[in-house]
């Protein structure tokens, strides 16, 4: 992600969280499940985020999901992940074993928490 403004360290950290939330939302909406426990996935072993900002640009003070910058970052992450998975649908994410409806994932999470 390339931001045309300056993000101080705290804002950059929040931007990374907001980007991760957008990515996770896309994975959940697509029904991608964690291969180890069947719960809705929040990432993959191959994903990562690079955030580049302009130290000479406009200074941003917030990148949370309710700020304009955060909303744009979240939307960019969501659409990028969704488009990539829909365009490059490979066997690893096409298997019915890797897809789970959200309710099933919640039930599995409850069962796992009851075992602890």
Outline where the language-model segments fall.
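A structural signal for small-residue-enriched, beta-sheet-centric alpha/beta enzyme cores
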Residues: 1-116
């Amino acid at each position: 992600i390339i931001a045309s403004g300056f993000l101080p360290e705290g804002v950059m950290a929040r931007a990374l969280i907001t980007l991760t939330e957008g990515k996770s939302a896309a994975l959940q909406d697509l029904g991608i499940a964690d291969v180890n426990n069947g719960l809705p996935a929040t990432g993959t072993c191959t994903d990562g985020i690079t955030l580049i900002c302009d130290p000479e640009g406009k200074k941003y003070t917030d990148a949370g999901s309710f700020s304009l910058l955060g909303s744009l970052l979240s939307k960019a992450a969501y659409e990028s992940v969704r488009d990539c998975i829909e365009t490059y649908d490979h066997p690893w994410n096409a298997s019915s074993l890797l897809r789970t409806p959200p309710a099933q994932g919640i039930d599995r999470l409850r069962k796992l928490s009851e075992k602890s």
